[in-house]
């Protein structure tokens, strides 16, 4: 660095009011990294000629090759304006949807953001996503409309057309901002209404309903983007220029003689200037007057581009002279017009000044953090700020004050961990020597040289040695000795090969309060840590070293070993970091997995989890090429899991090591990192493991050729159903409505189960509230264990009743009567989109009885048996009968549950759950039971005999089939599976929402690729003023691999898709369908050789899992020969 040294950055870090923590957000290829290059070049870190070409913040090789940013990188910049100096902590973030998790890690530690929008493409899908992320994190945005040069060079717009186009873009992004604002106001209003309804009405009087939405009472004047407010800048980052209207208002106020304040309000908008009267008036479109923005700003820029592109040297010289610029001879003679434009515009309208001035004036400092954001960061789950302990609420003042006193609590948030090579750390780099150190080295070299000469003269007087060995010196002799205090000697020690190949993990963090000092001990709080638990375990006023504190779950103590200043590709050592700054922390790899909260006070709660837009959905199994390298693979996958905020690493029940990523590009990057950085071995990667879900539907009304199912076909379907039911083992009864009645192996209990498809809306509600359902389960277990959850119980209970009300709203009708109150469990994993309903008269239990009510005596009595029933339901929903995939949208109704008295007595007596004792055979009068024939060794596998006998006077009822709870689990699982098989089964495919931008020339090819891959177009919209189309479609995840490459090849790179996981969709075709009608035989053939999509997916999953696959084989192979015989 030339202009901004580390010492200056350390000095600027102490002035919190002049710190700006910002990130650059945009759709892919809208110019984020090019803009960052321009801002970095203003500090002299890179040459201004390389800005936009070097991509300084893209330090990975694959980032440079692909031309897209894949990770968030931070750099500290210095900006001076007058007597004020500012420190800009700039974070460049990715625009590709696969890496949207990196955007989440960036916006959490920022106070503001720059939204970059392409002037040609306008507001794109990922622009909406990043703006929504910024809104959710309560950070203030400013707008940069980039690539204005494309309007001139590519689209050939006139200044008037360009002005209209820019107005449309501004209206689009303001409409999006208004939508976010409106939804927030309406949510707050709904919360207030819920609270008011919960309060009892003291007076019974006439109630008046307020029909207003509450939008009129909220000030949104500072919310929207508007050039006159100074939060919009127009730029061309590749050409190095940019401006806000404040720059031209200052110039023209002196030339025209109109006040700067007036020009600020009228330079953007439909205003024109009357030069005779020197007044600014409204534009009358009929008279063809030009707006001020066109007349005073755009026409000047257009004329400059026109002169340079036409190589009008006389006009160029005139413009340069009038602007008072100095252009070098090399740039003036250059044949590339871009070089000349960059040389002129970067001096006339420097982009760095326009953008950084807007950042300093319009974006907040760490001192301006709103109380709303502080409360949102501290309140996890369903908590409210008022429900937190008083010690925790007191931390709000520390956030707002951003104090740097010694008594201020140190609060740091780690948003992600990133890996760097050990050799790239500052302590392992050779540092330049100071003048004093160089003088000391010269003096020591002279002394050594004099000693060698003296020794050589002494040896010469005694006699020369062979080969002149006395005069030879070791090549390392001039190096400083180990005991000499030389700074460079430490860093120049050879690094072992093992150490040089290691990766060090640095925490990407921000200090919210207090001063982070090297060597300070601090608490690391996990996401499940609760300050309430700590305050209950540790007595008030406890003062001792942190190591002596009693163990508290999800809390550890660590030392801040190394602090770093993040400078893009470089790291600089720091001794301390004041509050409000972004920093890197070394030595936390053993304490932090992905993100964490660091605090000097244990009363601080962990920050709310990061909000990820993209859901990991793409799975692959990995294994080493050589089995002996499995330990390296396991270690590498652990490092990869820590280095990537979005990736998930799983070990399945089969022993497979599975990577779960957000998309195809993200998958490729993770595999490259695994091979080259973390595991450093050759690995084998399976085909993508496509997730599916199994469900049931109502019986279809039309057949496969879209004809209504008639009587004959209904008979055929019934016959087919009976054939399927005939495969069900004996002893299981199936009635006409699909009710399965199945006894346990010991005949002590009988279960009657029915499967019903849930409405789509109910399934969606269950998916959206999975976190709340999980909280209900945790609360129920907490209450059963006697733990205190009163602090959050009331707020959670309100959400539970709201969730219950939504279910009651959509589960209406005769067959769903009282269903919500009878919900016993959710599944799989007790928080999935399937429900278990208990309609048994003898046994009734409800999921609402735990968190929202009291458990009945009968439910408490049969709790052990009930847990077995629920466990069987969980197993059944975890793997369905078609291809062992989880179920979705299925309601299992337990119609009857009959228990014999023997089983009831067994439940009441715990001794009856033990195994039978062979030694008691003589005393029990034949009450023991043995399994196996006489030749086999008798095994003690039976339960203790029950004392009661049957009414018929038979021998005592003996359980020979293992523990009764295990029999209930297996029986319930089988009952659910059989209940599914007697209903029309369907597969559900994971679906991507696909946003494709393409020109009109290649629109047909895009549609062809989509239809080939089972895609479905939902919407097609043309961007106004361009020939670009935005196509919104849905595409199965199973068909998405290679989709981006194929569509780019077919369209010659003119179409670029963005894939985001959206929802699950039922595949309409029946995977077990066979032709039954004459029309179906004609259309599909006798054997239905053209197998349907669902069967293809089902068989692929079954093959992968090693399950039986029913495939067609050639019946008469010799009849396939078509070669004619020679006679």
Swiss-Prot record:
Activity regulation details: GTPase activity is stimulated in the presence of 60S ribosome subunits.
Pfam families according to UniProt: EFG_C, EFG_III, EFL1, GTP_EFTU
Domain of life: Eukaryota
Sample GO molecular function, one term: ribosome binding
Residues noted as binding GTP in the record, renumbered to the chain: 26-33, 92-96, 146-149
EC number, as in UniProt: 3.6.5.-
GO biological process, one term: cytosolic ribosome assembly
Basic and acidic residues bias locations: 438-452, 474-484
Region annotated Disordered, chain positions: 429-496
Class of this enzyme: hydrolase
Substrates-to-products reaction catalysed: GTP + H2O = GDP + phosphate + H(+)
Chain positions with N6-acetyllysine modification: 528
Domain named tr-type G: residues: 17-272
Keywords: Acetylation, Elongation factor, GTP-binding, Hydrolase, Nucleotide-binding, Protein biosynthesis, Ribosome biogenesis
Similarity comment text for this entry: Belongs to the TRAFAC class translation factor GTPase superfamily. Classic translation factor GTPase family.
Subunit-level organization: Associates with the 60S ribosomal subunit. Found in a complex consisting of the 60S ribosomal subunit, SBDS and EFL1.
Function: GTPase involved in the biogenesis of the 60S ribosomal subunit and translational activation of ribosomes. Together with SBDS, triggers the GTP-dependent release of EIF6 from 60S pre-ribosomes in the cytoplasm, thereby activating ribosomes for translation competence by allowing 80S ribosome assembly and facilitating EIF6 recycling to the nucleus, where it is required for 60S rRNA processing and nuclear export.
Protein known as: Elongation factor-like GTPase 1
Lineage, top ranks: Eukaryota, Metazoa, Chordata, Craniata, Vertebrata
């Amino acid at each position: 660095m030339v202009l901004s040294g580390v010492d200056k950055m350390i000095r600027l870090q102490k002035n919190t009011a002049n710190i700006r923590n910002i990130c650059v957000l945009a759709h892919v290829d809208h110019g984020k990294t090019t803009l960052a290059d321009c801002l970095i070049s203003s500090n002299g870190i890179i040459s201004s000629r390389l800005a936009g070409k070097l991509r300084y913040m893209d330090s990975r090789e694959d980032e440079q090759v692909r031309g897209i940013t894949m990770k968030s990188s931070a750099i500290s910049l210095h900006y001076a304006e007058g007597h004020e100096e500012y420190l800009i902590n700039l974070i460049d973030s990715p625009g590709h949807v696969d890496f949207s998790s990196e955007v989440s890690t960036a916006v959490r530690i920022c106070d503001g953001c720059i939204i970059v929008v392409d002037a040609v493409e306008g507001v794109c899908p990922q622009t909406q996503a990043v703006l929504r992320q910024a809104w959710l994190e309560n950070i203030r945005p400013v707008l940069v409309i980039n690539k204005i040069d494309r309007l001139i060079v590519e689209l050939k717009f006139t200044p008037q057309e360009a002005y209209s186009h820019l107005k449309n873009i501004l209206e689009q992004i303001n409409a999006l901002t208004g939508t976010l604002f409106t939804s927030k106001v309406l949510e707050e209003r709904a919360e207030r209404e819920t609270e008011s309804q919960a309060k009892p009405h003291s007076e019974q009087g006439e109630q008046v309903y307020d029909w207003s939405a509450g939008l009129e009472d909220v000030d949104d004047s500072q919310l929207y983007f508007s050039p006159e407010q100074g939060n919009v800048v127009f730029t061309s980052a590749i050409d190095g220029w940019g401006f806000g209207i404040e720059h031209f208002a200052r110039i023209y106020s002196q030339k025209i003689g109109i006040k700067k304040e007036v020009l600020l309000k009228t330079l953007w908008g439909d205003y024109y200037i009357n030069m005779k009267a020197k007044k600014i008036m409204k534009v009358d479109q009929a008279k063809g007057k030009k707006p001020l923005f066109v007349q005073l700003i755009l026409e000047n820029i257009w004329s400059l581009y026109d002169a340079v592109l036409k190589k009008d040297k006389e006009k160029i010289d005139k413009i340069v002279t009038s602007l008072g610029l100095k252009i070098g001879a090399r740039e003036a003679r250059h044949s590339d017009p871009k070089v000349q434009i960059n040389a002129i515009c970067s001096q006339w309208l420097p982009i760095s000044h326009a953008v950084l001035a807007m950042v300093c004036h319009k974006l907040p400092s760490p001192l301006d953090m709103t109380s709303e954001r502080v409360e949102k960061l501290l309140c996890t789950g369903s908590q409210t700020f008022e429900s937190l302990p008083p010690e925790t609420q007191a931390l709000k003042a520390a956030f707002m004050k951003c104090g740097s006193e010694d008594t201020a609590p140190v609060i740091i948030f780690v948003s992600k961990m990133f890996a760097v090579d050990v050799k790239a750390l500052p302590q392992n780099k050779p540092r330049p020597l100071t003048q004093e150190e160089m003088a000391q080295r010269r003096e020591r070299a002279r002394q050594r040289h004099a000693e060698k000469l003296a020794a050589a003269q002494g040896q010469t007087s005694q006699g020369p040695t062979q080969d002149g060995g006395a005069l030879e010196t070791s090549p390392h002799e001039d190096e400083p000795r180990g005991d000499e205090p030389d700074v460079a000697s430490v860093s120049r020690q050879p690094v072992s090969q093992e150490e040089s190949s290691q990766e060090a993990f640095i925490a990407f963090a921000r200090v919210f309060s207090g001063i982070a000092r090297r060597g300070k001990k601090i608490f690391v709080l996990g996401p499940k840590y609760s300050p309430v638990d700590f305050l209950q375990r540790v007595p008030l006023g406890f003062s001792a070293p942190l190591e002596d504190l009693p163990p508290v779950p999800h809390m550890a103590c660590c030392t801040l070993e190394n602090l770093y200043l993040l400078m893009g590709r470089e790291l600089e050592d720091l001794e301390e970091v004041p509050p409000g700054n972004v920093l890197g922390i070394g030595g936390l790899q053993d304490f932090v997995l992905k993100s964490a909260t660091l605090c000097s006070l244990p009363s601080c709660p962990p920050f709310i989890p990061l909000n990820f837009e993209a859901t990991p959905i793409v799975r692959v199994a990995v294994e080493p090429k050589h089995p002996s390298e499995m330990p390296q693979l396991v270690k590498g996958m652990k490092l990869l899991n820590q280095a990537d905020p979005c990736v998930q690493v799983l070990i399945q029940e089969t022993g497979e090591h599975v990577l779960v990523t957000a998309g195809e590009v993200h998958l490729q990057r993770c595999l490259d990192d695994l091979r080259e950085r973390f595991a450093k071995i050759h690995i084998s990667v399976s085909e993508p493991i496509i997730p599916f879900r199994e469900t049931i539907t109502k019986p279809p009304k039309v057949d496969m050729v879209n004809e209504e199912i008639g009587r004959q076909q209904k008979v055929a379907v019934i016959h087919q159903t009976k054939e399927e039911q005939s495969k069900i083992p004996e002893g299981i009864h199936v009635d006409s409505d699909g009710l399965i009645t199945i006894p346990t192996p010991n005949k002590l209990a009988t279960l009657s189960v029915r499967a019903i498809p849930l409405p789509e809306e109910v399934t969606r509600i269950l998916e959206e509230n999975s976190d709340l359902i999980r909280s209900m389960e945790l609360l129920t277990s907490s209450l059963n264990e006697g733990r205190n959850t009163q602090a959050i119980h009331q707020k959670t209970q309100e959400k539970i009743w709201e969730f219950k009300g939504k279910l009651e709203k959509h589960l209406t009708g005769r067959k769903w009567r009282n269903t919500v109150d009878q919900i016993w469990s959710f599944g799989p994993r007790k928080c999935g989109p399937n429900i278990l309903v208990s309609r048994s008269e003898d046994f009734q239990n409800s999921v609402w009885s735990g968190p929202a009510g009291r458990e009945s005596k009968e439910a408490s009595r049969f709790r052990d048996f009930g847990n077995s029933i629920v466990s069987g339901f969980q197993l059944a929903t975890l793997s369905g009968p078609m291809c062992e995939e989880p179920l979705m949208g299925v309601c299992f109704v337990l119609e009857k549950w009959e228990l014999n008295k023997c089983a009831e007595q067994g439940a009441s007596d715990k001794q009856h759950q033990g195994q039978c004792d062979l030694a008691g055979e003589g005393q029990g009068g034949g009450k023991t039971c043995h399994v196996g024939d006489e030749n086999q060794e008798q095994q003690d596998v039976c339960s203790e005999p029950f004392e009661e006998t049957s009414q018929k006077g038979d021998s005592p009822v003996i359980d020979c089939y293992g523990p009764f709870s295990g029999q209930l689990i297996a029986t319930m699982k089988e009952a659910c599976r059989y209940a599914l098989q007697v209903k029309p089964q369907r597969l559900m495919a994971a679906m991507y929402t696909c946003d494709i931008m393409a020109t009109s020339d290649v629109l047909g090819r895009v549609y062809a690729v989509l239809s080939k891959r089972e895609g479905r177009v939902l919407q097609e919209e043309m961007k106004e003023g361009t020939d670009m189309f935005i196509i919104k479609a849905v595409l199965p995840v199973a068909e998405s691999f290679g989709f981006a490459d194929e569509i780019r090849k077919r369209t010659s790179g003119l179409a670029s898709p963005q894939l985001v996981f959206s929802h699950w969709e039922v595949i309409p075709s029946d995977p077990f369908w066979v032709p039954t009608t004459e029309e179906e035989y004609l259309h599909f053939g006798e054997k239905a050789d053209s197998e349907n999509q669902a069967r293809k997916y089902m068989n692929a999953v079954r093959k992968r899992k090693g399950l039986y696959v029913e495939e067609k084989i050639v019946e008469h192979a010799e009849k396939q020969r078509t070669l004619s015989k020679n006679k």
